C-alpha cells in the first residue's frame, strides 16, 4: 500500500481526498454510506454570519455534462453551527475545514473571530466568490486588490490555516492567486463553479430566478485542470484541486497538474460512495506505477 498522507497548508490529511463545500452537508447526511473520518478532509457547507434561507424558485438544473445550482448559501448561520452542529461534528473525528462567506470585510472577520476559540477545526476555507455590498456588488474574487484586502484581514484575525477558494470567472486566475499569497494565505482551493444559465423553452424565460447559476460537474473539469496547472506553478502555495472529478483517473490528473489534494463535489450527489473508490483507485495507481507516496507524482505533468 502506498503512502497517501499529504500535508495541505499545514493540515495533515490521511489521504488527498476531501469533500467540496456545499456537496457533503455537514457530513452527517452521508454517514450511512461513508464516514467523514474516511476522508482526508471534510469541508462543510458554506457558513455566513446570520442564517440564510437561500434562493427561491428552482435551485438545481441538470445539464448534459453537469449541474447548475443557485442555492443562495442556505445555512444555519455561524452561531447555530458553533452551538448546535460543531459539538456533534467533533465526534466524527474528521479533519474539518470551515467554509465561510460574507457580504463585506467585517462579516468575514467576525465569523473568523467567532471560530477562533472552537475545538475540532483544522482550518478555514474563505469563499471569495461573494459580492461585496460596499463595492457596488463587485465579487471579491475577480479583483486582486479586494482579494488582497480581505485575505489580509482574515489572516490577521486567526491562527487557523487560511485557504482561499478561487473563482474561475476571471481573466487571469493566477493574478488572484498571487494576491492571496501576498496577503498571507496558507493554501488555495480551486475552482469554484463556472457562471452559467439555462432557459426554459416552454416558458421562454430563464430557469433560475437569479438568471445566473453555478455550473459544476464533468463539464468544467478541463477548465479546472488548466487553472490548477497554472496556479500551482505561479505561486508557492499548496493547491486543493476540484471541478468535475468523478473517478480516480480525474483525481490523478489534478495531482499531476500540481494539486496537493483534491475535493469531490457534484459526484457526491450521483455516487455517494465515490470518495471510497477514488481513494482506493489512487492507491492502486501508485502501486501499479511504482510510486511509494502520492507526493511523488505531484506536478509531474509540468512543462
UniProtKB/Swiss-Prot annotation:
Where does the chain bind FMN? 21, 45-46, 99, 127, 165, 191, 217, 243-244, 265-266
Co-factor(s): FMN
Q: What is its main location?
A: cytoplasm
User: What role is this protein assigned?
Assistant: Catalyzes the conversion of dihydroorotate to orotate with NAD(+) as electron acceptor.
Mind telling me what this protein is named? Dihydroorotate dehydrogenase B (NAD(+)), catalytic subunit
Which species is this record about?
A: Natranaerobius thermophilus (strain ATCC BAA-1301 / DSM 18059 / JW/NM-WN-LF)
Kindly identify the residues recorded as the active site. Answer: 130
Annotated signal peptide: none
What molecular function terms (GO) are annotated for this protein? dihydroorotate dehydrogenase (NAD+) activity
The reply on keyword Cytoplasm is yes
Q: Which UniProt keywords are given for this protein, alphabetically ordered?
A: Cytoplasm, Flavoprotein, FMN, NAD, Oxidoreductase, Pyrimidine biosynthesis
Amino acid at each position: 500500500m502506498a503512502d497517501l498522507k499529504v500535508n495541505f497548508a499545514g493540515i495533515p490529511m490521511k489521504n488527498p481526498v476531501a469533500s467540496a463545500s456545499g456537496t457533503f452537508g455537514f457530513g452527517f447526511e452521508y454517514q450511512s454510506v461513508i464516514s467523514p473520518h474516511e476522508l482526508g478532509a471534510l469541508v462543510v457547507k458554506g457558513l455566513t454570519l446570520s442564517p440564510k434561507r437561500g434562493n427561491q424558485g428552482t435551485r438545481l438544473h441538470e445539464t448534459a455534462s453537469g449541474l447548475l445550482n443557485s442555492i443562495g448559501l442556505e445555512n444555519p448561520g455561524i452561531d447555530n453551527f458553533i452551538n448546535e452542529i460543531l459539538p456533534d461534528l467533533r465526534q466524527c473525528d474528521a479533519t474539518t475545514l470551515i467554509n465561510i462567506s460574507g457580504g463585506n470585510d467585517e462579516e468575514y472577520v467576525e465569523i473568523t473571530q467567532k471560530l477562533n476559540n472552537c475545538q475540532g477545526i483544522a482550518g478555514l476555507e474563505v469563499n471569495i466568490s461573494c459580492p461585496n455590498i460596499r463595492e457596488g456588488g463587485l465579487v471579491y474574487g475577480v479583483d486582486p486588490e479586494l482579494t488582497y484586502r480581505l485575505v489580509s484581514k482574515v489572516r490577521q484575525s486567526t491562527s487557523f490555516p487560511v485557504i482561499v477558494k478561487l473563482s474561475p470567472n476571471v481573466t487571469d486566475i493566477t493574478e488572484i492567486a498571487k494576491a492571496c499569497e501576498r496577503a498571507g494565505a496558507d493554501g488555495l482551493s480551486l475552482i469554484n463553479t463556472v457562471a452559467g444559465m439555462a432557459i426554459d423553452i416552454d416558458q421562454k424565460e430563464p430557469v433560475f430566478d437569479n438568471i445566473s447559476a453555478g455550473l459544476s460537474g464533468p463539464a468544467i473539469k478541463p477548465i479546472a485542470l488548466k487553472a490548477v496547472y497554472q496556479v500551482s506553478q505561479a505561486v508557492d502555495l499548496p493547491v486543493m484541486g476540484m471541478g468535475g472529478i468523478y473517478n480516480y483517473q480525474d483525481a490523478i490528473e489534478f495531482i499531476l497538474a500540481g494539486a496537493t489534494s483534491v475535493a469531490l463535489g457534484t459526484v457526491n450527489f450521483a455516487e455517494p460512495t465515490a470518495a471510497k473508490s477514488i481513494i482506493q483507485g489512487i492507491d492502486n495507481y501508485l502501486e501499479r506505477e511504482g510510486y511509494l507516496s502520492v507526493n511523488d507524482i505531484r506536478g509531474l505533468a509540468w512543462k
